């Protein structure tokens, strides 16, 4: 994966007991992320690639890298669909 997710800068968010709560100011909708999605959210800085995030997830939760890659891909797609984050192309160099 050579894509880098980045959080939507228009959203307000806070970490509560290790989980992320996101509030959309446009419609006041609240999104509560589970522990895994919260970790993806924290690493979605537009710099780390999906592969890098998957590696961190695999280490954090002691799961196979391929399983982590699949989880990250699904989470990123879901969060992008909800306009909570955007995906940019990673700069290879």
Give the location of each predicted region.
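Long, low-complexity, charged/polar intrinsically disordered regions in eukaryotic proteins
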Residues: 1-25
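Long, charge-rich, low-complexity alpha-helical segments
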Residues: 26-93
């Amino acid at each position: 994966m050579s894509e880098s997710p980045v959080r939507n800068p228009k959203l307000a968010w806070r970490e509560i007991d290790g989980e992320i709560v996101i509030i959309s100011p446009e419609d006041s909708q609240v999104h509560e992320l589970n522990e895994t999605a919260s970790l993806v959210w924290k690493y979605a800085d537009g710099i780390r690639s999906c592969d890098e995030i998957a590696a961190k997830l695999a280490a954090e939760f002691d799961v196979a890298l391929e399983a982590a890659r699949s989880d990250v891909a699904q989470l990123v797609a879901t969060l992008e669909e909800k306009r909570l984050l955007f995906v940019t192309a990673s700069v290879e160099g």
